[in-house]
């Protein structure tokens, strides 16, 4: 799915794609290197959500470049749904958003993290097999050291944050 909405109107396709996956207890994991421009988009989303007051009943994790260090804290939330947010070269214009299931993670080039997000999710699945894990990937514009977050990526993060802040499962 491509995020082509450049107005301030809600992106209904993106909203539906995200909210259709939200079942039970939710954890959102931001992955990325904040000193490498758009690669730090995962932690930036967590910061945006926290600055807006967090999300009731949702666990937020800024995992930086070492998500494997958060396996036990994530599992301790007993979440049913885990959403990873990371920069990835998805071959689209900067700021484009794609949602991937686990079976597609190994086919996408995720930013600068070792070990791969796939290994991380495999370890989580070992701890809780029925957890629904998916990835929201955003096409970066610049991942150079010291580069700022691009306007395109920041706009996509604000849209995603808007979706979560407006979401009401009842």
Stretches found by the model and what they are:
Residues 1-140, 147-158, 163-169:
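N-terminal catalytic or cofactor-binding beta/alpha core of small enzyme domains
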